Every structure is written in C-alpha cells, then in structure tokens.
Amino acid sequence: MIYQMQMPAKIELDESSHSDSFGKFIAQPLERGYGVTLGNLMRRVLLASLPGTAITGIKIENVYHEFSTIQGVREDVPEIVLNLKKVRFRSQCKRSCKTTVTLVGPMEFTAGVIQPQEGEFEVLNKDLHIATINAGTTVTLDIFIGRGRGYVPAEENRAEGMPLGFIPIDSIFTPIRNVKFTVENTRVGQRTDYEKMILEVETDGSITPDDSISLAGRVISDHVLLFADFSPAEEEYTEEEFKQQDDEFETMRRLLATKIEDLDLSVRSHNCLRLAEIDTLGELVSHKEDELLNYKNFGKKSLTELKEQLDKFDLKFGMDITRYQMK
C-alpha cells in the first residue's frame, strides 16, 4: 500500500479579519513538521524577496552632509532622513526617478507634498510628518526614489554620478510590515497528529495580502522546481544535431532581441510598452498576461494586438527565456 501524504485542498482565508492590508491564511491538514517548514519559508520570502518602492537618497539645496541643520527648519537633517524612510509608495514603475519639492514656510512638510512628475508613483501615508518649515524660509529638496527588495543600507545607495550634496538613505523596499505564523494540531478522521498552519500577513497597502502570498508562492515554486526537474543524465547528440541546436538557439536569441519599435504595433500599444520599460520581444514574452494588464493604460485591446504579433513568431506570454540571455 502506498502512503498518501496529507495536503490541503486549498488555502483558506479568514474573511472576518481580512482587509486591503491584513490577511490571515490557513493551510490544513499538513503532515507533522510541515507547518513550521512552510511557515518559515513563506515568512522569509515575504520579508526579503518581494519588490517595493522607497526613497534612496535626497539632496537639499545648500546642505552638503547628513549631519547638518537647516536655517528655519525645526528638524535637523538626521531627523528628516529618519522620517523620509517611513514614506510608503505604490508604484508599477521599474526605473528610478527623481522629484523636486519646494517648501515655503510657514508650513508642515508631510509625505503628501511629495508628488510625482509623470505619475510614476503614489504616496500612501500622505499625513506622515517629515519637517516643520518656519515663516520666511524656503527649502528646495530633490528626492530620489527607486525599486528594490528587502532592506538596502545607505552605502549601497551611493552611486557614481550623483550630484554634490547627495545624501543616501537606508531603503526599506519590502511592502510587508509584519508576518507571523502559528502551528496547531488538527484532526483528520481518527488521527489528531496532523498540523494546521495559520499565516498572518500585514502589508503597507502597496500590495494586498492575497497578492503578496501568491507572489511569494511563485518565488518558492520557481526555486523548488529546479530540484523537481533535476536530471543528471545528459543526452548524446551527433555533430549535425549539435549544429542544428546551435542554429536554432542563435535564431531564437536574435528573435528575442528584436526591438519593440520594429514591430507593426499601434501607437497606443507602443506607448504602453515604453512606459512599462519593455524594449524587446524577450522582455515582452517574459511577462504574463495579468502582469501586463496591471500597467497603466494597458487594456485588453492592446493585449490582443500583442498576442497576434507573438503568434506570428510562434511565441507566447510567460516564456522562460533565461537560457537565451547573454551571460
């Protein structure tokens, strides 16, 4: 008789406590030991591997280091930096951007004053206090915003080519505020030694708890599949087969390197892809359909047009193009 491992049919959601920033998820039944294994794995990936947006540095006019004080501003620069670390963003933009804020006192500088120049991001905690500007004082502040994962110290945000007076900031990119899990016993038939794992996820509002666990699950799945598909045996090929494989490989690599601007697309689709920073066929097919629909102004009409283009090249969305990328 083959022993069948117990696994949850699906992940349950606690509707009573669910919100846009908090979710409680239940996985049961699990074999003994799997509650802690899965809980630890999900917690680590949620906290360290999900992308987010944060301030990476600032430049204040006539201020040249982070230990300065600013005439007519109640807070000193270190305190302003600490407050700026707490600003949370929602953004689909992959590239770094800069925005300039001019503060004319008397006023309270809150996070809501930080506005994008081209709609690259949205500030979530608009009421967050950053500084108090006294009457007769004007402060000009450049704010540098970037995308990343987890926590990045200020030194790693210090890049070449930054202007004189650039002050790097520790960046907390993770959109997850807190993750915790508990493991309880649960019954299956007459047996009570199975486990129930309860996972609680709190986000900063830039991503829903549902999307966060789904994204974390895909990250874990992509890594585990490397082991599931492992095969040490290598197939033997003739010299002619090797040459054919090389030719097909190079043909595909050249195809994936095709510029989007060379495709016969509508102006709307071109603009959508440009804003999403998708420049080549390879970058396009590496996206899934639902990911593209999340981009601003990207609708089903544009998606249908792109699918028709991909069909011409025998390509599809969601392809793994890792092996074709240049080392």
From Swiss-Prot:
Example of a GO biological process term: DNA-templated transcription
* Alpha C-terminal domain (alpha-CTD): annotated span: 247-327
The cysteines joined by S-S bonds are none
Q: Which InterPro entries match?
A: DNA-dir_RNA_pol_insert, DNA-dir_RNA_pol_RpoA/D/Rpb3, DNA-dir_RpoA, RBP11-like, RNAP_asu_C, RNApol_insert_sf
For whether the record's keyword set contains Transferase, the answer is yes
| SMART domains (UniProt xref) | RPOLD (SM00662)
Q: Which SUPFAM superfamilies match?
A: C-terminal domain of RNA polymerase alpha subunit, Insert subdomain of RNA polymerase alpha subunit, RBP11-like subunits of RNA polymerase
Q: Name one Pfam family in it.
A: RNA_pol_A_CTD
The UniProt keyword set, sorted, is: DNA-directed RNA polymerase, Nucleotidyltransferase, Transcription, Transferase
Report residue spans for region: Alpha N-terminal domain (alpha-NTD): 1-231
* Catalyses which reaction(s): RNA(n) + a ribonucleoside 5'-triphosphate = RNA(n+1) + diphosphate
* EC number annotated for this UniProt entry: 2.7.7.6
* GO molecular function terms noted in the UniProt entry: DNA binding; DNA-directed RNA polymerase activity; protein dimerization activity
Cell membrane: is it a keyword of this entry?
no
Q: What would be one Gene Ontology cellular-component term for the protein?
A: cytoplasm
Its biological purpose is as follows: DNA-dependent RNA polymerase catalyzes the transcription of DNA into RNA using the four ribonucleoside triphosphates as substrates.
Q: Quaternary structure per UniProt?
A: Homodimer. The RNAP catalytic core consists of 2 alpha, 1 beta, 1 beta' and 1 omega subunit. When a sigma factor is associated with the core the holoenzyme is formed, which can initiate transcription.
Name the family the entry cites: Belongs to the RNA polymerase alpha chain family.
Free-text domain note:
The N-terminal domain is essential for RNAP assembly and basal transcription, whereas the C-terminal domain is involved in interaction with transcriptional regulators and with upstream promoter elements.
Q: What is this protein called?
A: DNA-directed RNA polymerase subunit alpha
Name the species this protein comes from. Answer: Chlorobium chlorochromatii (strain CaD3)
Q: Which gene encodes it?
A: rpoA
